[in-house]
Amino acid sequence: MSLIKSISGIRGTIGGKPGDGLSPIDIVKFTYAYCATLPSRKPQPNGGKYKIVVGKDARLSGGMVENLVVGTLMACGVDVVRIGLASTPTTELAVMFAKADGGIILTASHNPRQWNALKLLNDKGEFLTAAEGQAILDLAAAEDFNFADVDDLGHITEHDYTDEHLDAVMALEAVDVQAIKDAHFKVVLDAINSVGGIIMPRLLERLGVECVKLNCDPTGDFAHNPEPLPKNLTDLSETVVREGADLGISVDPDVDRLAFICENGEPFVEEYTLVSVASYLFERAAAIAKKEGRTLAEVTAPYKPVSCSNLSSSRALRDVTEEYGGEYEATAVGEVNVTTKMRQTGALIGGEGNGGVIYPASHYGRDAMVGVALFLSNLAHKKMKVSELKRTYPEYHIAKNKIELSDKGLIDRILEEMKKEYAAEEINDIDGVKISFESKRQWVHLRRSNTEPIIRIYSEAPTLAAAESLANEVIAIAERVINDQN
C-alpha cells in the first residue's frame, strides 16, 4: 500500500488501512479539507453556494472514489457539477465553463491501474499554490469535521463538457483546421483504454484526420504501462508502420501528456512534443512579423515572445525559441511552477519535457488536445514526414539516473559539493542544482525526491554517450561525499 500526500493533492494505491493507502477515510478527510478551505481561497462563491466540478479518468476505482468525493462535497453544503469521464484539461476548462469555484480531478495520471488520486483546482481551473495545498494538508490532519445540516446539503447537476472543450481547441487562431483537413492525415491513436479514447477520436474527426484506434475503449484496464515512453509504445509503433500511417499519437490516462511516433515507427521522443509546438508558434509569429513589418512582440500580443519549461526539460526548447528571436525562462519542476512563471513573463508557450504542452491562449494547463491540434498544424504547413520534421530540430539526448541514500541528510551535502566542484560553470539552484556547460551544450540537474531518500539526476548532451558520461561524473562526486561520511 502507498499513500502520498503533497501540496498538489493526495494519491495512493486503492485499499488498505487509513493512512496506508488511498482508503475511503482518506478520500473523505481530504475532500472535506478542500471544502473547508474554500472561503480562504474565495471569500464569496459565484452563486448562492460554492460549486465544484468533479471529473474522472477511466480507472477501475474511479466510480468508488467519485461517489465518496461527491457525497462529501454535498455533505459540506457544496453544489457539485459531475462531468463523469473527462480528461484533466476538460475538467480544468469545465471549472471556467460552469463558473464554478473550483474542481477536483480524479486521476493518478501515468501511475498504474491500482493507483488513484485527487488533484485540486482553484476557480480558474488551475492547480492550487503551495500555501493553499499545505493548508489543506494541515486541516485534513486535524480531523476537525463540521458538516452541513439537512437543509443546507449540496445538490448535483451533470454535464458533459467534451464538446465545449473541442470547440475551444478548434477556435484557436494558431490551429489551422483547413490546412490539416487538406493534408488528409492518417494516424494511429493509443489511448491506453482511458478517457483519451473518448475525446481524442472526436477531435481528430473534426480535424478531418483518419484515425486508427488502439486501446480506445475506456474500461480503465490499461493495456500497458500508462506512461507514454518509447518502451511502452511498441504496439503503437508496429501499428503505425503496418497501417502506413503518417504518425502515431499516444496519450496518458488523463490526456494531459502527449507523445508521437514517426511514420517509420521510431519515437519522436516526448521531450520534442513541446519543442515542435513551440517552434511552430515562434516560426509562425516571426513570418507574420516579417510580412507585416511588425515586431515579434506585436504579433504575439497579448502574450510575450517567451517560452518556459522546467529545469529538467530539454535545451532544445531554448534553442528553437532563441532561433526566432524569443526568450526562454526555466522554472522549478512541477506544472504549477511552470504556469506561475508563464503568468509572470506573459509567455506564449510553455510546458514540461514529459509531453505536457501549456498554451495560455487556451488555458494554463497541460492539454494533449491542444498539443495535437498545434502539432498537426505544424506538420500540415511543413509538408514533410514526421521523421523529417524531427531532424529539423537540435539533437539532444537525456539520460536519467538516481542515487539512493541511506541517510537523507546527505542530500544537502552532495548538492553543496556539486556547487563547489562546478563553481566556474553556470549554476541554477532554484530546484536542487543544475549545472550548465554552455560551450559543450550540456547540462546536468540533481534534485531531491519529495518522498524518498533519493537524488534524481537528469543529464543532457548532443549524444546519449556524452549525457551518460556527465551523469557518471557527478555520481562519482556524490559517492566521494558519501564515502567521506562513513
For the regions a language model picked out, list residue spans one by one.
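Phosphate-binding and adjacent anionic-ligand microenvironments
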Residues: 247, 293, 299-486
